């Protein structure tokens, strides 16, 4: 994990601030966020700062080491898939640690939009939704976006933009970003 931390810290020296950051675990580390943002011609940076071995115990330290200095506009939290045993053993501790992470992010960056992203477990997703609601964050269930056709959407978006149509949006379109990241 130390190698990954060092890599992210070096990348952060060149990274733009005020973007979208995916903070996930496991296979999330393989999502090429910046390349997908470039391919879909997003006009804001999207970074993947996910870790193998990320858990609720080390999440705050990893956030501080690799994300805090990016001053992200939005953080996508995709944490919980590897926590089923912990959740089953102590649901209250799971909830407290997740809420502590969210509160820490809000303390470090008061303007940061935090999105709790669903995992592939209905029981934990119910808890994640509760956590998101109780901390005034967004919860997005990505299970319904698995059938999305990214190439078709990219073609339509490109066509609409070449026609001169620009949509007004004062925040980054989270649902679209999640579709891009989790269905590539």
What are these regions (language model features)?
Residues 38-43, 61-184:
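Alpha-helical cap/lid subdomain in secreted, periplasmic
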Residues 1-52, 57, 63-71:
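Serine-esterase "nucleophile elbow" of acetyl-processing enzymes
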